[in-house]
UniProtKB/Swiss-Prot annotation:
Coiled coil: none annotated. Part of the ABC transporter complex LsrABCD involved in autoinducer 2 (AI-2) import. Probably responsible for the translocation of the substrate across the membrane. The keyword Transmembrane applies. It is a multi-pass membrane protein. The chain crosses the membrane at residues 7-27, 45-65, 70-90, 91-111, 118-138, 162-182, 216-236, 240-260, 261-281, 288-308. The gene is lsrD. It comes from Salmonella typhi. Pfam families: BPD_transp_2. This is Autoinducer 2 import system permease protein LsrD. The lineage of its organism: Bacteria, Pseudomonadati, Pseudomonadota, Gammaproteobacteria, Enterobacterales. CDD domains: TM_PBP1_transp_AraH_like.
């Protein structure tokens, strides 16, 4: 296949991203400053870190809407463990394991109950979110303050740069490379696509369906934990609400990136570009003085437009055939 046609959607997203940055740059010239442009990504890049493994979940025919609560649970757990005197490196490792366990719980419930993944992860979203609030209350970390007092070396980590590139953005780029290789260059990635197209056929073809699903959900949970650690480092405090605003932008990024919500198709590169597109949209509107409520409404509208547009694109032949029949009937 012609590379231009194969990556036409990704190329369109890249062009739209450049246009978006230039458009917001005309409104607020500060956004065109390379340092402002790079360091502003730290405010939203965790959306992209979670969107990458979530792409694999959606391509497999699944769904996970509990990652925001997982971020909050992992963040407050990190704070509580540190507050109890645990060495920070060990607390971070346990936090990452907790994120993976949250993903495994999702996968286990989905596989062994056969209930729609959206319903299961809706339940675990409240389970993890409630657990985070309970843990926060027990630790006396209610409100916006959370748990602070982290070492300067840790709080500086998400605010420093390497070769002029912010550390969270470097994490995102590394994750992009890892998940792109995993999704598009390995047997596991091929299995994810086949499961999304037909889980039953994949099972009859001796593809390890359950193991693959456990892996992609665990990676989403682990990515949520990584996002939690970066957010705690960035803000300097551990709070149970750190992932509260992640749901809509992250799912919008995955769908806008080209993932079919019914499974079977998707692109890591597309999700990465779409995450930047959604992030800079929010950032640009904020710098232009637009209220957060309007920014959220625009993100929701963008998601609806993309879903409807892709649905029309997928069924364009049936639509054209129906239109042709109607026109012929009128002419007759």
């Amino acid at each position: 296949m012609n590379p231009w046609r194969r990556y036409s959607w990704e190329i369109a997203l890249a062009a739209l991203l450049i246009f978006e940055i230039l458009a917001f740059g005309l409104i607020n010239p500060r956004l065109l400053d390379i340092n402002v442009l790079l360091f502003s990504t730290s405010d939203f890049i965790c959306i992209g870190i979670v969107a990458l493994p979530l792409t694999m979940v959606i391509v497999s025919g699944g769904m996970d809407i509990s990652f925001g609560s997982t971020i909050g649970l992992c963040a407050i757990t990190l704070g509580v463990l540190f507050q109890l005197g645990m060495p920070l490196p060990l607390a971070i490792i346990i936090t990452l394991l907790l994120g993976a366990i949250c993903g495994l719980i999702n996968a286990g419930l989905i596989i062994y109950t056969g209930v729609n993944p959206l319903v299961i992860t809706l339940g675990t979203m409240y389970l993890f979110g409630g657990s985070a609030l309970l843990l926060s209350g027990m630790a006396g970390a209610t409100g916006y303050e959370g748990i602070g007092g982290f070492p300067t070396a840790f709080t500086d980590f998400a605010n420093i740069s390497f070769l002029g590139i912010p550390m969270p953005l470097i994490f995102f780029l590394v994750c992009c490379l890892f998940f792109w290789l995993l999704m598009h260059r390995t047997h596991m990635g091929r299995n994810v696509f086949l499961i999304g197209q037909s889980a039953r056929v994949a099972q009859y073809s001796a593809i390890p369906v359950n193991r693959t699903l456990y892996t992609v959900y665990a990676m989403t949970g682990c990515a949520s934990a990584i996002a939690a650690v970066l957010l705690v480092s960035y803000f300097g405090s551990a709070r149970s609400d750190l992932g509260a605003s992640f749901l809509m932008p992250t799912i919008t990024a995955v769908v806008l990136g080209g993932a079919n919500i019914y499974g079977g198709s998707g692109s890591i590169m597309g999700s990465a570009l779409a995450a930047l597109l959604v992030g800079f949209l929010q950032q640009g509107l904020q710098m232009a003085g637009v209220p957060n409520q309007i920014s959220s409404a625009l993100s929701g509208a963008l998601l609806i437009v993309v879903v409807v547009g892709r649905s029309v694109s997928l069924h364009r032949h049936q639509i054209l055939e129906w239109y042709s029949r109607r026109r012929n009937a009128h002419q007759a």
